[in-house]
A protein has these predicted regions:
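Conserved ABC ATPase "signature" region
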Residues: 128, 135-153, 205
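The feature captures the beta-strand-to-loop junction immediately N-terminal to the Walker
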Residues: 65-67
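Helix-to-loop junction immediately C-terminal to a conserved catalytic motif
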Residues: 80
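Conserved signature/switch motifs of ABC ATPase nucleotide-binding domains
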Residues: 156-159, 177
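Catalytic Walker B motif of ABC-type/P-loop ATPase nucleotide-binding domains
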Residues: 182-185
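Hydrophobic anchor residue at the start of the ABC signature
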Residues: 171
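Short coil-to-helix segment of the ABC ATPase nucleotide-binding domain corresponding to the Q-loop/switch region
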Residues: 117-125
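Conserved ABC transporter NBD signature motif
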Residues: 88-100
């Protein structure tokens, strides 16, 4: 008869090795594998994305940059589970995304606030939809408003707020439930330059405090360089990944850094690429 101790030894699972643990920790947070998206239109099929493969690390600030129509927003909607892929797979922590995700915050170019609710009330709308405890949610909302410089504006309605203030409220609403990932689709595109600068600084501070994983869609080269760990440059439609650029600049970043040779070097690298691809044209 086999020895009981031997049987026990055979059925025990070995502890994970350091290599296995390292592999798990290095697993991408968000991954696109051979992703293609084709839209049906009256004029025939339109291929918005073509064979896009990309892995985002947990806690990474990743910007997607490219010309209009290259599929940037489509990529974000696929990441959110709000669109099905025509081909390919989207995964989060190794699990396939095949339905709208509930573990994210989303910020669009338009704040989309309810006019009959105050700034605080608009933020708490997200908490109510998720059935979060009221007292702790309100405390969190006030902390977020303070973090973006809106203390004292809690009871203001959207028509009493500037465009930049409304977008700050939208960002707070997206963060009320402590999402591990924030998806942002050109959130500062409709704002004036000074307001954009302030919101970029606010976003950097929020990201630095929480280190959530951010997927950021933008047309602004300087904005992408300032905020990102990596910048993904897309080709014109059908959108493919043209270049992946690591941004090796110290954090936290300051507005004065935009005048440094290092910052301008990244700017120039991306602009030269866009010129070479015909996205930009000089006289």
């Amino acid at each position: 008869m086999p020895d009981d101790g031997l049987l026990t030894t055979r059925t025990q699972k070995p502890a994970p090795t350091a290599a296995v643990q390292a592999a798990v920790s290095q697993q991408p947070y968000l991954e696109f594998r051979n992703l293609t998206k084709v839209y049906a239109t009256a004029d025939g099929p339109v291929r918005a994305l073509d064979q896009v493969s990309l892995a985002q690390r947990q806690g990474e600030f990743l910007s997607i940059l490219g010309p209009s129509g290259c599929g940037k927003s489509t990529l974000l909607m696929l990441a959110a589970g709000l669109l099905p892929a025509s081909n390919g797979v989207v995964t989060v922590r190794g699990k396939r995304v095949d339905a709208p995700r509930t573990d994210i915050g989303i910020v669009f170019q338009s704040p989309v606030l309810l006019e009959w609710r105050t700034a605080l009330g608009n933020i708490l709308l997200q908490a109510e939809a998720r059935h979060l405890e009221r007292k702790s949610a309100e405390r969190r909302a006030r902390e977020l408003l303070a973090a973006v410089g809106l203390t004292g504006f809690e009871a203001k309605y959207p028509d009493e707020l500037s465009g930049g203030m409304r977008q700050r409220v939208s960002i707070c609403r997206a963060l009320i439930h402590h999402p591990p990932q924030l998806l942002m689709d050109e959130p500062f595109g409709a704002l004036d330059a000074l307001t954009r600068d302030q919101l970029v600084l606010d976003l950097q501070r929020l990201w630095n405090d929480a280190r959530m994983t951010v997927l950021f869609i933008t047309h602004s080269v300087a904005e992408a360089v300032f905020l990102s760990d990596r910048v993904i440059v897309m080709t014109p439609r059908p959108g493919r990944i043209d270049r992946v650029i690591d941004i090796d600049l110290p954090r936290p970043r300051t507005l004065a850094m935009r005048e440094t040779p290092e910052f301008n070097g990244y700017n120039r690298q991306i602009l030269d690429l866009l010129l070479a691809r015909g996205v930009l044209r000089e006289c």
